[in-house]
From Swiss-Prot:
Ranges for region Disordered: 239-295
Sequence segments annotated as region (Sufficient for localization to endoplasmic reticulum tubular network): 1-210
Membrane side Cytoplasmic: residue ranges: 1-71, 115-192, 214-406
Membrane topology qualifier: Multi-pass membrane protein
TM annotation in the entry: 72-92, 94-114
Protein name, UniProt field: Protrudin
InterPro entries: Protrudin (IPR042405), Znf_FYVE (IPR000306), Znf_FYVE-rel (IPR017455), Znf_FYVE_PHD (IPR011011), Znf_RING/FYVE/PHD (IPR013083)
GO molecular function list: zinc ion binding
Subcellular location: Recycling endosome membrane; Endoplasmic reticulum membrane; Cell projection, Growth cone membrane
Lineage: Eukaryota, Metazoa, Chordata, Craniata, Vertebrata
Lumenal side: 93
Species of provenance: Gallus gallus
Alphabetical GO biological process terms: endoplasmic reticulum tubular network formation; neuron projection development; neurotrophin TRK receptor signaling pathway; positive regulation of axon extension; protein localization to plasma membrane; vesicle-mediated transport
Biased composition (Pro residues): 250-263
Keyword Transmembrane helix: yes
Amino acid sequence: MQAAERDGVAGGLEATAAVAATGGGEASSEPPSPPKAASFDLLDLVRSYRRLELYLEPLRDAAEGVRALLRWQRPLCSLLVCLGLNFLLLTLDQAAWYSVLALLVLLPALLGYLQETYRVRPSERELLRRKYHSVRREDLRRVQLSRQEALAQVKCFLIQLEGFLSGLCYNCEAVYRVLYWENPTVSSQFYGALLGSVCILYLLPLCWVMAILNSTLFLGNSQFYQVIKELKASVEQSLGTKPLESAPEPAKPLPTDAPPDRTPTPTSTEDLTPGSVEEAEEAEPDEEFKDAIEEDDEGSQCSADFDLSLPDNGFMSKNDVIRSKVSRLTERLRKRYPSNNFGTCTGCGATFSVLKKRRSCSNCGNSFCSRCCSFKVPKAVMGATAPEAQRETVFVCAQCNQMLIK
């Protein structure tokens, strides 16, 4: 009986193998189907990028804290950290440093374990409230966005990606310029610093090398010197050693003879337009009271031009015609020059007056005198796209001028 069963099982296996071979032959005769093309969804890429931002948020916060310490945004904290690190680097031995590293490894593990162990278990009602009123990190894949929100997310991601790639390319170009000696001064400084670092590592102990590196990071940046300058200025102001700036004495008016009554002779065919008034406003002499002289010169220049644009009607004398034209010109110039001259210059601190006119920076909007706000830049530098923006210029302060021309 068992022998018959074994024969039956063997026959069934042979039949199955024959059917499989026949089917395999038919399958091999058919051409293989082309592989399915991999689909690329830009919105999924953006979601993954946002999730990565959430996961790396603690590292970003730590980097921001380190950057704030190195930039001396809080001078007292930066000073304490710098001195504390130097003290630890110079006093701790090798065994103590291994203990500190072990503590740094165990501390996050212990904090995570305690947080999970002693975490307050929320009630069912609290869980329902969190479910309907919060979005968790694991729920980001199931969030349904509208088309406008998706496009906004994709656009923001592409802008950030473009900025990151631009900065990376700029840094790579700077490295290549140093390596290929395009700027011999910078390249010599770089290789000299490398050789000096190797010599210091060979001659000095490691603790001293780390202390020098820490001091260089904290003390060798421009923010530290800015803090020192501010501290020095505050100390001088508190002690009263800084002399007060004396106000400029007004110049004595020169005696002038009464000009004869005469009509202005037409010297050009230029009409009084806003562009001509703006060009007259931009003219700057180099005298002490250039604003007052500029106002007088522009008034006479524009009055001569205005005489051509308004013909005589025959019922008024020449003096009446001139007075009417000058009154209209004065109204136009009053719009150009504000009557409120109170305040001080942001740059030099000079008080605005009739002789010291106020001028606003076209980039930052702060109020300056004509000496501090005397730099001209094209409007195209500030983002204007009109064709005339390449030719038209506006006044900016010195700080904005340095920022815009870079």
